[in-house]
Amino acid sequence: EYKASVLSLREKYREQIDIHLGMEVECYQSEWEDLATYRKDMEYCILGQHQIVLNGKSSYDLRNGDELKQYVDQIEYACYHGLCDYIAHPDACMWIYPRIDDGVRTAAARIAEISAKYDVPLEINCGSGVRTGLSQYEDCVRYPYPVCIFFEEAAAHGCRAVLGLDIHDPKLFFTDEYINRALSVVEGLDLNI
């Protein structure tokens, strides 16, 4: 139904705007066949691993290096199999993660290595993470995401980056506030945006 609707709108408005067929996907190895089918049908597949479940926890509720490793393993699996065109909010795992520790540094470096190896851009997300505002964590005050360490690693590895407006209210398209907040996190980094 989604595909038919988008293709119908593309045809109807072809003289006025370009409409592309795409969707945000999550990578679960048990769903490999469905993911491969979606990938063939879509012009764009955006990987958003925000609903991965790890021992009863979503990626918004990770608290240790082992859980971060599992999160990154899912991202690597998707990129290895060519299931995505870019990685949405690669740092969403930091939503409540308490501090920037060795597990975070390892995850950030691995995600940058994966991005560079498979030439899959990383999204600087201008949505939920910055809309909630700055929060106090054990070691600093920061947005839940984007998180600077991830994009320091991206810059060091020469990764491409994209800005993503992950918003759920069309009125938010009329403000640059959240874009500016997200860009403030990566200011001064030599990113290929």
Tell me what each language-model feature is.
Residues 94-95, 99-193:
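Charged catalytic cores and adjacent phosphate/nucleic-acid-binding surfaces used
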